[in-house]
Amino acid sequence: MIRNVLLAFMICSGMTLLGGCSSVMSHTGGKEGTYPGTRASATMIGDDETNWGTKSLAILDMPFTAVMDTLLLPWDVFRKDSSVRSRVEKSEANAQATNAVIPPARMPDN
């Protein structure tokens, strides 16, 4: 009896920990829109360059990713884009705007 309960607990824990991998990976970056993990899994499944092992894992993970993306939908709607890439792009745009206003220095005549 205890062995069956322990086995069921281990299986459920493993499914919970492994489920929604695409969703978790997609949410670690910048703003990807809504349902980023599900879109990533669908793209991976439809890609001809993806091997059969990865496709089978993506197919197995797809329902869990869809559930995780649904649970994280409010976060996707209200979060701000604070990825490293977006911060660097914003900083470079500010630097370009500053440099456009400041005229270049004159070179001394020899």
From Swiss-Prot:
Transmembrane segments: none annotated. InterPro entries: DUF1375. Keywords: Signal. Residues 1-26 form the signal peptide. Pfam families: DUF1375. It comes from the Bacteria. Residues 87-110 are annotated as: Disordered. One of its GO terms (biological process) is DNA damage response. One of its GO terms (cellular component) is cell outer membrane. To E.coli YceK. This is Uncharacterized protein YidQ. It comes from Escherichia coli (strain K12). The lineage of its organism: Bacteria, Pseudomonadati, Pseudomonadota, Gammaproteobacteria, Enterobacterales. The gene is yidQ.
